[in-house]
């Protein structure tokens, strides 16, 4: 089977970052890709905890009071696949931070841990979280987010690999130093993430795939693991991706 699955591996197309290849579809992927979608509460909110004067809840409806932003950006998975020109809509996280969160924050915030309804979390440095292109998005390609892509709202940080883009956002914890378990989950998933040792910055342009290992050493491993899974996620179109250029890196 790997004979034809290997043909699916996206070849490097012009303009993509190091180690990335282009695919046609935008599959649900990640640590939780095979799990049932989380249940969204009738009135979703973001719990704000950690280094704040008083913990509070921020209803997602509060996003309606902030200026809307549209962002067209590529999405890059740490496993090596990319999709181009996704149209995200939402609010700039910087605007949400300055309007609703920073007034309650204690001095010296260095990291923010975003957690979703599915229990997955990612830790961003305050510098990365406040970048101009980081959104809390509720729409993708002209339609409300589906469960596969993070409904009701998710983090979109295009300069970082997908594992920093927490879906189903429901909790934000402020820290004054790097959390010991920056990416937290439970059971088998926690073990998997500790083995993978994700990079704390995960910047695509620097190919920061792993906390300790050089990026090139992971490309073959990720391809061996991800190829069969990607084939099943692409469904009936898996055997006929659109032509890509032949420059492989």
Can you say where each PLM-predicted feature lies in the sequence?
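Extended, aromatic/histidine-rich regions of cofactor-dependent oxidoreductases associated
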Residues: 1-42, 46, 102-249
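Mid-length scaffold segments of soluble, non-membrane domains
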Residues: 74-122
């Amino acid at each position: 089977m790997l004979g034809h699955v290997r043909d699916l591996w996206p070849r490097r197309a012009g303009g993509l970052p190091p180690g990335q290849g282009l695919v046609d579809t935008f599959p649900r992927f990640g640590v939780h890709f095979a799990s049932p979608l989380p249940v969204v509460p009738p009135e979703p909110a973001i719990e704000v905890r950690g280094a704040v004067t008083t913990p509070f809840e921020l209803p997602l409806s509060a996003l309606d009071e902030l200026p809307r932003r549209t962002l067209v950006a590529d999405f890059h998975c740490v496993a090596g696949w990319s999709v181009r020109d996704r149209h995200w809509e939402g609010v700039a996280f910087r605007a949400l931070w300055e309007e609703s969160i920073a007034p309650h924050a204690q001095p010296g915030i260095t990291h923010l841990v975003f957690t979703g309804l599915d229990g997955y979390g990612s830790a961003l440095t305050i510098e990365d979280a406040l970048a101009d292109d980081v959104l809390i998005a509720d729409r993708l390609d002209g339609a409300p987010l589906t469960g596969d892509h993070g409904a009701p709202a998710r983090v979109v940080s295009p300069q970082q690999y997908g594992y920093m883009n927490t879906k189903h956002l429901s909790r934000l914890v402020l820290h004054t130093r790097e959390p010991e378990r920056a990416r937290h989950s439970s059971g088998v998933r926690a073990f998997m993430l500790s083995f993978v040792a994700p990079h704390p910055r995960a910047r695509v342009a620097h190919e920061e795939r792993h906390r300790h290992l050089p990026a090139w050493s992971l490309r073959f491993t990720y391809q061996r693991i991800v190829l069969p899974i990607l084939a099943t996620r692409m469904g009936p179109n898996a055997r006929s991706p659109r032509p890509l250029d032949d420059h492989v890196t």
